[in-house]
Amino acid sequence: MKKIFSLALISLFAVILLAACGSKGSNGEASKESKKDTLAAIKDNDKIVFGVKTDTRLFGLKNPSSGEIEGFDIDIAKQIAKDILGDEKKAQFKEVTSKTRIPMLQNGDIDAIVATMTITEERKKEVDFSDVYFEAGQSLLVKKGSKIKSVENLGKGSKVLAVKGSTSSQNIREKAPEASVLEFENYAEAFTALKSGQGDALTTDNAILYGMADENKNYQLTGKPFTDEPYGIAVKKGQSALAKEINASLKKMKSDGRYDEIYKKWIKEDPAE
């Protein structure tokens, strides 16, 4: 009886040991998967998937006639694909918003974010950034004839429109603490709300607001920019090889004239030195 009990006990320990080893192996595989090299996967798949805006005039906007997404960010992404994979047509695009872009990157839905994304210390905790590829500043868009001339005019009773998940939404609460902030899912919704009278001003980066003012001549930017908003291209944390390739591409673009060409095409002026 004791012998049978001992054999049963040994068998039980063996099962537990095997299960533990199997679990360790699975965790190891999961760990390896989470650290998978994005650049290597891009080269294996022969494509690079960028998360881009589709509602931001001048930077990323879907052309209703062709169905293609067009803008500054799109052209920059295409040139990165050309430098990494040899062909700009190997760039693929998925729509993101300020709210969805980081989760989509972390889930592996996209390889990189090129979507008017400001480099901040808070975001650096979640993603890694490339070098700055565009210098913007937060400003206000108002209807022509508005009494609002600067952020200082946004007092009690003022309503400011912003986009969820954006640094602009956070900044305006600090710069105009007495104003009410209404948040929307994207810039198109926020601009529609401004035009329908739901707010007194719309706030985001001046580069984005220029596109809105260009679209509707009844609106204009007012006051000076009240923040610095350096845009960067985001990749998953730890993907230093991909970030290095992107930085090399940006540097090459600026040295061979491609960057200036794209800048003038969309922003209609020379890049600031």
Curated annotation (Swiss-Prot):
Function: Part of the ABC transporter complex GlnHMPQ involved in glutamine transport.
Subunit structure: The complex is composed of two ATP-binding proteins (GlnQ), two transmembrane proteins (GlnM and GlnP) and a solute-binding protein (GlnH).
Protein's name in the database: ABC transporter glutamine-binding protein GlnH
Lineage top rank: taxon: Bacteria
Induction: Positively regulated by TnrA under nitrogen-limited conditions.
Pfam family, one: SBP_bac_3
Keywords: Amino-acid transport, Cell membrane, Lipoprotein, Membrane, Palmitate, Signal, Transport
Signal peptide: 1-20
GO process terms (BP): amino acid transport
Organism name: Bacillus subtilis (strain 168)
Major subcellular site: membrane
Membrane topology term: Lipid-anchor
GO cellular component labels: extracellular region; outer membrane-bounded periplasmic space; plasma membrane
Keyword Flavoprotein assigned: no
Family: Belongs to the bacterial solute-binding protein 3 family.
A GO molecular-function annotation: ligand-gated monoatomic ion channel activity
Lipidation (S-diacylglycerol cysteine): 21
Lipidation (N-palmitoyl cysteine): 21
Locations listed in the record: Cell membrane
InterPro entries with a match to the protein in the record: Bact_solute-bind_prot3 (IPR051455), Iontro_rcpt_C (IPR001320), SBP_3_CS (IPR018313), Solute-binding_3/MltF_N (IPR001638)
